[in-house]
C-alpha cells in the first residue's frame, strides 16, 4: 500500500516537472502531498469480560428477536477469538427455542466444539454447564444426534 502511494507521488512529481526532468524547476510539494505514516488504532474504551457477557446475554434475551437477528448474533459471536461463556450460549439456545429454530441450536453447539479447538476439556465443561437447559428445552447435542460420526 505504501509502495503504491510512493509510485503515485513519483508519477505526479514527474508530471509536474515537465520535459526537463525532476531536477529542474519542480515545485516543492506542499504539506498535503507529504506521505505520513499513520496508524489507525481504536481509541475506544475496552470492554470487560463481564460487560461482554452481559451485552450478549441481553442481545439474545430480547423478547422480539427475530430469526435474522439470531443468526447475525450467532455469526458475530463465532467470529470472536473465544469460546462463549455458558450463560451466553444458554441465552442463545433459549432464543432459538422461542423461534422454534432447532437447526440453529445444533449449529451453536457445533460452533462451540469447533471454537474449543485442541482443548478437549472445554466442550465437555460447556455441555455439563448447559445440561439442565438442554434437558429443559429438549435439545439434543450433535453427539446424541450422531452428527459427530458423519
UniProtKB/Swiss-Prot annotation:
GO CC annotation terms, alphabetical: mitochondrial inner membrane; respiratory chain complex IV
Residues carrying N6-acetyllysine: 87, 113
Compartments where found: Mitochondrion inner membrane
Coiled-coil annotated spans: none
Membrane topology according to the record: Peripheral membrane protein
InterPro entries cross-referenced by the UniProt entry: Cyt_c_oxidase_su5A/6, Cyt_c_oxidase_su5A/6_sf
Keyword annotations from UniProtKB, A to Z: Acetylation, Heme, Iron, Membrane, Metal-binding, Mitochondrion, Mitochondrion inner membrane, Phosphoprotein, Transit peptide, Ubl conjugation
Motif SIFI-degron mapped to chain: 2-17
SUPFAM superfamilies: Cytochrome c oxidase subunit E
Alphabetized PANTHER family for the sequence: CYTOCHROME C OXIDASE POLYPEPTIDE, CYTOCHROME C OXIDASE SUBUNIT 5A, MITOCHONDRIAL
Family, per entry: Belongs to the cytochrome c oxidase subunit 5A family.
Protein name (Swiss-Prot/TrEMBL): Cytochrome c oxidase subunit 5A, mitochondrial
Natural source organism: Plecturocebus donacophilus (Bolivian gray titi monkey)
Gene name in the database record: COX5A
